[in-house]
């Protein structure tokens, strides 16, 4: 697969970059994508939810009324889950939601996500981002030049760049990642993937 390289003004540079078909034109495995995204979202959960059961609610040591003769169902404690103010029956307790996915499946899922975006024509290769200082307005103008100012966009960089990260972090539609650290969810949760030219090689080295 080949894509034209463009600059930050949105104009073609005349250069064409060849993308590895193993990464950008692979067969899409929906099941691998499902497993990886499910794992990523589950692992974000804290699992700290907690309610009190009848042994943890304050009070309730005394039998609320006599066993027989009241016409009511028998009760041994006013903190039974059947009564107002009582403990919760089978309520949520703290536990982990971690799901393990093999590295092979994770790589397959990322290849599938990138191939899906490439097949839809939603990958853009940009020559370079040149920021001399932190400037959100400059980044917003670049997105506007690319026609992405109203679209959720993932920008992939070859390495961490503090100036670029801080320039783009206040733009709601923008998500910036280092190329080899972008997850399947990052790729799917955007309308367009913008890759810096140098980031293409890093992705191919990681996933090919």
UniProtKB/Swiss-Prot annotation:
Coiled coil: none annotated. Keywords: Ribonucleoprotein, Ribosomal protein, RNA-binding, rRNA-binding. GO terms for biological process: translation. The keyword Cell inner membrane does not apply. One of the primary rRNA binding proteins, this protein initially binds near the 5'-end of the 23S rRNA. It is important during the early stages of 50S assembly. It makes multiple contacts with different domains of the 23S rRNA in the assembled 50S subunit and ribosome. Forms part of the polypeptide exit tunnel. The gene is rplD. Pfam families: Ribosomal_L4 (PF00573). It comes from Prosthecochloris aestuarii (strain DSM 271 / SK 413). SUPFAM superfamilies: Ribosomal protein L4 (SSF52166). GO terms for molecular function: rRNA binding; structural constituent of ribosome. GO terms for cellular component: ribonucleoprotein complex; ribosome. Residues 45-84 are annotated as: Disordered. Residues 60-71 have a biased composition (Basic residues). This is Large ribosomal subunit protein uL4. Part of the 50S ribosomal subunit. It comes from the Bacteria.
């Amino acid at each position: 697969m080949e894509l034209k390289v463009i600059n930050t003004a949105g104009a073609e540079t005349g250069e064409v970059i060849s993308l590895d078909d193993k990464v950008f034109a692979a067969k899409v495995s929906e099941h691998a994508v499902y497993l990886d995204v499910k794992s990523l979202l589950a692992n974000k959960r804290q699992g700290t939810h907690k309610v009190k059961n009848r042994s943890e609610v304050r009070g309730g040591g005394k039998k609320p009324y006599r066993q027989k003769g009241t016409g009511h169902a028998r009760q041994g404690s006013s903190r039974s889950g059947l009564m107002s103010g009582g403990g919760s029956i089978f309520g949520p307790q703290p536990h982990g939601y971690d799901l393990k996915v093999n590295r092979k499946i994770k790589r397959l899922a990322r290849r599938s996500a990138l191939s899906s975006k490439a097949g839809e024509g939603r990958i853009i290769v940009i020559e370079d981002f040149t920021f001399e200082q932190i400037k959100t307005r400059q980044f917003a103008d670049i997105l506007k030049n690319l026609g992405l100012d109203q679209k959720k966009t993932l920008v992939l960089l070859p390495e961490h760049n503090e100036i670029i990260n801080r320039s783009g972090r206040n733009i709601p539609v923008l998500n910036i990642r280092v190329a080899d650290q972008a997850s399947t969810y990052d790729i799917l949760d955007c309308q367009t993937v913008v890759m810096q030219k140098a980031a293409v090689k890093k992705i191919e080295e990681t996933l090919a």
